[in-house]
């Protein structure tokens, strides 16, 4: 086993990812877009600020997961794996194109919330969330396949 020197920054990053891997962290963050849209629609800026603070602190609020079996835990591991491999998430290859398509969907949902167009808000929120779950689902499938091919990578 190799002993590596670590910095405080490395410790924070490691702690961040371990805690964020708790499925409660991921599942509670899925409510972020609907909460933002609600706050904008109702012009509730205090609630919007609260959502921002919660979203920022969320990855540190939960203890590390006991095991790696939960799907949302694997979503976080897949995201970290993707970042460590320096694979971008905003290009036109699959599944990244889903993230690219999510930008205008979420943007239009936000615009519709500002304009107080409830049907458009709801529709584009659903479209955005479907694209996001499709994207992370594809990442998890790649991560799981990589795990089966080479468990030590």
Q: What are these model-predicted stretches?
A:
Residues 1-153:
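Short amphipathic, positively biased membrane-proximal segments
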């Amino acid at each position: 086993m190799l002993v590596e020197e670590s910095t405080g920054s490395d410790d924070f990053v490691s702690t961040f990812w371990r805690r964020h891997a708790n499925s409660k962290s991921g599942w509670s963050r899925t409510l972020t877009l609907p909460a933002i849209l609600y706050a904008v629609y109702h012009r509730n800026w205090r609630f919007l600020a609260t959502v921002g603070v919660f979203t920022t602190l969320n990855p540190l609020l939960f203890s590390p997961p006991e095991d790696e079996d939960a799907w949302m835990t694997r979503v976080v591991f897949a995201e970290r794996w993707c970042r460590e491999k320096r694979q971008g998430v905003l290009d036109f290859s699959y599944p990244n194109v889903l993230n690219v398509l999510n930008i205008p969907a979420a943007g239009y949902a936000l615009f519709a919330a500002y304009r107080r167009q409830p049907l458009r808000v709801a529709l584009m929120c659903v479209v955005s969330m479907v694209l996001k779950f499709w994207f992370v689902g594809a990442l998890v499938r790649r991560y799981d396949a990589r795990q089966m091919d080479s468990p030590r990578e």
